[in-house]
């Protein structure tokens, strides 16, 4: 058994479909899940640190810490539902989110990560919520998909526009056919030089 198969076996849930699809490499699929688990752990830890800032009478940091801890629990619930065995509906919620497109998860993670940073800008909120934000960015990049092959990009670049005329590739090609190039030789006659 290879190292990749061991990692995929550890991170796969029972009866789990492949929601991301075969086009994503294994290290991106499971790396994003690992990043989400680590981000959730640190968000909960640093959210607790922000909650202790009530000692300095900073209510906004208290609220930011609570939001950050809730965001950490939500990310942990979605990325590793095995951590919440005592709740019966966790797998249902995780499967429902897994069935949605990846940009939904990316938007959810990014939206949950921004408020604690705005409310209490500091290293604890920046690092804890920043990891959740990074997980959302990784899922967003996965939602965009892979770049096309070189042959596909060349074929798309050589397609004709308007039927018979090939695409123009010189420097003077513009949107308007009769457009004149800019002249940088002198000032315009109506310029007041002010």
UniProtKB/Swiss-Prot annotation:
Keyword Signal, does the record have it? no
Tell me which UniProt keywords the record has, alphabetically: Calcium, Calcium channel, Calcium transport, Cell membrane, Cell projection, Cytoplasmic vesicle, Endocytosis, Endosome, Ion channel, Ion transport, Membrane, Synapse, Transmembrane, Transmembrane helix, Transport
According to the UniProt entry, its GO molecular function terms are:
calcium channel activity; identical protein binding
The places in or outside the cell where this protein is found are: Cell membrane; Cytoplasmic vesicle, Secretory vesicle, Synaptic vesicle membrane; Presynaptic cell membrane; Endosome
Q: Cite the position(s) of the site with description Calcium ion selectivity.
A: 79
GO terms of biological process kind = bulk synaptic vesicle endocytosis; cell competition in a multicellular organism; clathrin-dependent synaptic vesicle endocytosis; photoreceptor cell differentiation; positive regulation of neuron apoptotic process; positive regulation of presynaptic cytosolic calcium concentration; synaptic vesicle endocytosis
Q: Which InterPro entries match?
A: TVP18/Ca-channel_flower (IPR019365)
Activity regulation information from UniProt: Channel activity is inhibited by La(3+), which reduces Ca(2+) influx and thus inhibits it's function in promoting activity-dependent bulk endocytosis (ADBE) in response to high stimuli.
Function of the protein: Transmembrane protein which mediates synaptic endocytosis, fitness-based cell culling, neuronal culling, morphogen gradient scaling, and calcium transport. Regulates synaptic endocytosis and hence couples exo- with endocytosis. Controls two major modes of synaptic vesicle (SV) endocytosis in the synaptic boutons of neuromuscular junctions (NMJs); Ca(2+) channel-independent Clathrin-mediated endocytosis (CME) in response to mild stimulation, and Ca(2+) channel-dependent activity-dependent bulk endocytosis (ADBE) in response to strong stimulation.
Q: Which PANTHER family is this protein grouped with? A: CALCIUM CHANNEL FLOWER HOMOLOG (PTHR13314:SF2)
Q: How does it assemble?
A: Homomultimer. Associates with the dally/ magu complex.
Provide the family line. Belongs to the calcium channel flower family.
Q: What name does the UniProt record give this protein?
A: Calcium channel flower
